[in-house]
Amino acid sequence: MSYPIERVRADFPLLASEVNGQPLAYLDSAASAQKPQSVIEREAEFYRHEYAAVHRGIHTLSAQATSAMEAVREQVAAFINAASVEEIVFVRGTTEAINLVANSYGRTFIQPGDNLIITEMEHHANIVPWQMLAEARGVEVRVLPLAEDGSLDVAQLPGLLDERTRLLAVTQISNVLGALNPVKTMIAQAKAVGAVTLVDGAQSIMHQTVDVQDLDCDFFVFSGHKIYGPSGIGVLYGKRDLLQAMPPWEGGGAMIRQVSLRTGTTYADSPWRFEAGSPNTGGIMGLGAALDYVTALGREEIQRYESSLMKYALEALKQVPDLTLYGPAERHGVIAFNLGQHHAYDVGSFLDRYGIAIRTGHHCAMPLMEHYGVPSMCRASLAVYTTREEIDRLVAGLQRIHRLLGS
C-alpha cells in the first residue's frame, strides 16, 4: 500500500497556508514540526472540558485529570519501550532534561578529576550544561571528533574512555548533518568502563523507532514539539534505579513526601521527585495525541517514506550549481547546505519570498560550524507531510537564486 501523503497533509491545517502569496512549503520540521488536527483538538478539549489541577485533588475533575496525565506517562513508556512507567519524567523539553541530568546526576556522582565525553556534532543543549558542570566541579570534557565524511570518528572513542570516565552524552541523529550515530555500540563501549550514557533523541524520535532497552542507555531525552506535539513538553527517560539514586533538581510542590520546619524535607520517589510545581497538563495531553498519531501512521511506514524522500531530495539537489552539501552520504531527516559564497541568511530570505521555509544560521551547533569553517548553513528538513513537489520547489528556488546572484 502506498504512503497516504495527501491524507497526511490534510491532517495538518497549517500546511494549507500561503506565505508571500505562495503555497507554503514547510521544510523546517527539524526546528519544530507542525501539529495535526488531532493534537490541536486534544489539547483544546482538555482545557474546554477536563481541566483541573492534578495530584491530591479529591474532586472528580482533579482525579480524572491526574489519571489522564498518568495514562500518557504509560503511553510514553510503551512508545520508547521503557521497562517501567516510573522511568518517565515530564519536563519542558530536551534542554531541561539534559540540564536536569547534569545538575542532579552530574553534581552528585561526577567528582573533580573525572571526565565526560560529548561529540563535535552536538547541539548546544548537549554541550553547555556539561561545560557548566565541568567548570563547577573541576571535570574534564572530552570531545569525540568528526571523520572526514561527516560521520562521527567512532574509532577514536576507546582512546577517550578510561577509568575516570563517568558519562557519555551523544546525539542519536545530528540536527545539522542528519548523521545516524551508532549509539548502541558507543553505549556498550562506555559501559565497559563503568560510564553512564545519555542519548539526545530530539531529532531521532520523529524519524526512528526508539527502544531504550535495546539501546541500554541510562538516559534518553526528547521534546514533544519535534514529534508533532505541543511546545513546552518533553521527556526524560532514566533507568529507575539511577533516577531513584539522584537528588531532586528543583524544589516545590508535588515532588515531596513530607515537609517539616523541624526535621526537614523528604522527597517523593522518581519520577515525581523531578516534577516540582504544576505540570503542563495540556501539553502532556497533546503529547499523548501526537504519539497516537505517529503510531497510527506506523513508524516503519514513516521511515520507509522519509528514506525514499531523502534519496529523491539528494538526487534532485545535484541539479543546483555551486551547492555544497554537509554531512555523510547517508542522512536522516535533514539536509545542510550552502549555495556558492552566499550567506545562508540571504539564501533563506530569497526562498521565503517563494513560500519555502527553511532554517538558516549555526543551528545551535557552533563547534560544528567551526569544524567546517563556515559561519552558518542552510538546512532543509523532512517530515511525515513533506512531498516531492516541495523538494522540487526547493531545487527550483535555489536554481533561481543562483541565476540571480551567481556563485
UniProtKB/Swiss-Prot annotation:
Protein keywords: Cytoplasm, Lyase, Pyridoxal phosphate, Transferase
Cofactor dependency: pyridoxal 5'-phosphate
Primary location class: cytoplasm
Top-rank taxon: Bacteria
Keyword Disulfide bond: no
Cellular compartment(s): Cytoplasm
Subunit structure, as described in the record: Homodimer. Interacts with SufE and the SufBCD complex composed of SufB, SufC and SufD. The interaction with SufE is required to mediate the direct transfer of the sulfur atom from the S-sulfanylcysteine.
Protein name: Cysteine desulfurase
Taxonomic lineage: Bacteria, Pseudomonadati, Pseudomonadota, Gammaproteobacteria, Enterobacterales
Gene: sufS
